[in-house]
């Protein structure tokens, strides 16, 4: 009973009419299958004419296909191999051909790959001695260990975000230490002179205001006309070319209305 439970299921198929069990066991031994005595191969001949194998899905642990023609196994047969094999099971396609085999190897590798098998390997089987036929090469591939429709969680990539170092041991620069004594001193505001705080020039004026007022008196202008010049015609500040004959600002340089009239130091002095 225990030996039957441990017995592994192997399917051997061929496009030939006959396939001896001894040949199947010899090939499986050379392919590296362990405990060969526990194998009880199921043999199907003339498999190229079968549309579907009479086996349940995922019921076979290994498939051995022995082909004597270039068309076997077809894409449809390779799809059947994938259906009946358990996840992680292997398929081995052995060719009985002579002559150039490179193109046929590529064709079989493509077929098993399109059927969903992984890691196809090319095997040299010329060393296997059989009484009924001689092998030239083989292709071995593996069915994925996961089932179609199964899902698994993908690990999300870890994103390295910028990290701010808040180590209190780091020495910080005191902003006040960057200032000199001169920077810390309060600026001294200029002291207003006597003329700036009064409407008229002081008695001992040295800032030049007394001279300006004196020139204004000579022109017959009042202090208000000097400090805040106005014009009813709007042309008094443009210069003598635009002033009328009775303009009080006649003889003065151009100025802006509403701003203090500034007289030069040599104003009203005779030219030499």
From Swiss-Prot:
Which GO CC annotations does the UniProt entry carry? Answer: mitochondrial intermembrane space
Q: What InterPro entries does UniProt report for this protein, alphabetically?
A: Anamorsin, CIAPIN1, SAM-dependent_MTases_sf
Binding residues annotated for [2Fe-2S] cluster, in chain numbering = 195, 202, 205, 207
What's any GO biological process attached to this entry? Answer: iron-sulfur cluster assembly
Q: Region entry Linker: which residue ranges?
A: 157-185
Query: Where is the motif Cx2C motif 1 annotated in this sequence?
Result: 233-236
**Entry keywords, A to Z:** 2Fe-2S, 4Fe-4S, Cytoplasm, Iron, Iron-sulfur, Metal-binding, Mitochondrion
Location in the cell reads: Cytoplasm; Mitochondrion intermembrane space
Q: Taxonomically, which superkingdom?
A: Eukaryota
The region called N-terminal SAM-like domain is annotated at: 1-156
- Entry keyword Ribonucleoprotein: no
Q: Which residues bind [4Fe-4S] cluster?
A: 233, 236, 244, 247
Extract the ranges annotated as region (Fe-S binding site B): 233-247
Q: Which cofactor does it need?
A: [2Fe-2S] cluster; [4Fe-4S] cluster
- Ranges for the region named Fe-S binding site A are 195-207
The set of disulfide-linked cysteines is none
Looking up Pfam families in the UniProt record yields:
CIAPIN1
Principal location: cytoplasm
The sequence motif named Cx2C motif 2 is recorded at 244-247
Protein task? Component of the cytosolic iron-sulfur (Fe-S) protein assembly (CIA) machinery. Required for the maturation of extramitochondrial Fe-S proteins. Part of an electron transfer chain functioning in an early step of cytosolic Fe-S biogenesis, facilitating the de novo assembly of a [4Fe-4S] cluster on the cytosolic Fe-S scaffold complex. Electrons are transferred from NADPH via FAD- and FMN-containing diflavin oxidoreductase TAH18/ATR3.
Question: What is stated about domains?
Answer: The C-terminal domain binds 2 Fe-S clusters but is otherwise mostly in an intrinsically disordered conformation. The N-terminal domain has structural similarity with S-adenosyl-L-methionine-dependent methyltransferases, but does not bind S-adenosyl-L-methionine. It is required for correct assembly of the 2 Fe-S clusters.
- Which PANTHER family does the UniProt entry name for this protein? ANAMORSIN
Oligomeric state and partners? Monomer. Interacts with ATR3.
Name the family the entry cites.
Belongs to the anamorsin family.
Report what the protein is called.
Anamorsin homolog
